[in-house]
């Protein structure tokens, strides 16, 4: 069994951060060591929430505790997502380094959540800069959305061709693999939910239906990052992991839409996560 140290947000109600990625990774046969960056009542896109940011010192303290009992060497990957403070960024990267000293084959997947005023996703000051300056160069895999792709690359990425160039540019910044979780307005196919995979072997696009939610559910990016990492650790090639992830997430979104839910319906979709319908193919474009 593979083990992932997942350093993300926790919400008591609903699904985002570790609540969105842990259960699907477990369904995929991965043991998840969840370390929370914040504990909130609910995700920030409700517009109001209660809770706290975890003190940044606790992140290395927890990792050191796992190391002290001799288990950190069994960690196969570090996954980071929503970060609660600028100080947490450096601590998370230090933890990824510690894990790699204990297991040289371990991966670091950074899901660079930067927030969006338009969507109501609130991220602390300094996190964006920390992700660009500290996390990006150290990540093996980076999984931005379109806005984050623009911020990380410094390129416009206003259309599909520009998004491909921006993703390829990120490969020169440190990561070996780039997943653009949602191309949005820069998608290849209008009216679809398009994702992109770029690595040194090529570029792939996967297009699936875009479901007409009254309010788009939160936590989809967390789900994508977690499932892609789980599929990789289960021995799939990157294009295979990308395709499996896209199909599993589509099934989750289809079920969530049918139930008219603002929160991801991961429990209802559990069987689909374990055995997704392989309806949508990853198209190699470069």
From Swiss-Prot:
GO BP of this protein: pyridoxal 5'-phosphate salvage
Q: Where does ATP bind?
A: 111, 148, 181
Quote the InterPro entries the UniProt record gives. PM/HMP-P_kinase-1, PyrdxlKinase, Pyridoxal_kinase_PdxY, Ribokinase-like
Q: Which pathway, per its entry?
A: Cofactor metabolism; pyridoxal 5'-phosphate salvage; pyridoxal 5'-phosphate from pyridoxal: step 1/1
The record's CDD domains line, in alphabetical order, gives: pyridoxal_pyridoxamine_kinase (cd01173)
Q: Which family does it belong to?
A: Belongs to the pyridoxine kinase family. PdxY subfamily.
Q: How does it assemble?
A: Homodimer.
Q: Which HAMAP family match?
A: PdxY
What does this chain do? Pyridoxal kinase involved in the salvage pathway of pyridoxal 5'-phosphate (PLP). Catalyzes the phosphorylation of pyridoxal to PLP.
Q: Which NCBIfam families match?
A: PRK05756.1, pyridox_kin
Q: What is this protein called?
A: Pyridoxal kinase PdxY
Specify the species.
Actinobacillus succinogenes (strain ATCC 55618 / DSM 22257 / CCUG 43843 / 130Z)
User: Top-down, what is the taxonomic lineage of the species of origin?
Assistant: Bacteria, Pseudomonadati, Pseudomonadota, Gammaproteobacteria, Pasteurellales
